[in-house]
From Swiss-Prot:
Assigned protein family: Belongs to the GPI19 family.
Protein name: Phosphatidylinositol N-acetylglucosaminyltransferase subunit GPI19
Pathway: Glycolipid biosynthesis; glycosylphosphatidylinositol-anchor biosynthesis
GO biological process: cell wall organization; GPI anchor biosynthetic process
Subcellular location: Endoplasmic reticulum membrane
Summary of the function given for this chain in its UniProt record: Part of the complex catalyzing the transfer of N-acetylglucosamine from UDP-N-acetylglucosamine to phosphatidylinositol, the first step of GPI biosynthesis. Involved in cell wall biosynthesis.
Enzyme class: transferase
Subunit organization: Component of the phosphatidylinositol N-acetylglucosaminyltransferase complex.
Provenance organism: Eremothecium gossypii (strain ATCC 10895 / CBS 109.51 / FGSC 9923 / NRRL Y-1056) (Yeast)
Superkingdom classification of source: Eukaryota
Amino acid sequence: MKQDKRKYSGFVQSVGITCVLILIILWTLLPYPLLDPEKRLAEPQTTTESISLFLDELVELFPQRYWIICIQCMILMDMLFVYIGLPIFNQSVLTVRLDDLRTITDSKASVVMCESHAEFLTSYAHTETSGVYDLPITEVSRLLYGKARHKSD
């Protein structure tokens, strides 16, 4: 039941937004007034004149066209700020430096501070809550590219 309600509300929203967009485009592109000022004062003779008179009166209810351009420009600038300004702000201000310890751990972590490798093995390596420890590059290289790996190939 909840899924159907979401489908219907999404459909109604998309149709409503499309109608508003079409109305805005027509409002900005239609000439105003549709009828000459002399013909507006007279009684409409044809159906097209009466429709044009109705549309002229309908357009008078809307704000001036200047405001639709201003609103569209403000929306565009807001989009530029969101798409460009916020990621730059996040990258330059909110992101910690790469050499900061907060990039690899948080306040709940158990950071290893050992004097020797043997002390690390006895204190942290085989316990349930191992500490955060940077592996030496020599051990990583030996494990990945050592002689034992080449013999198995």
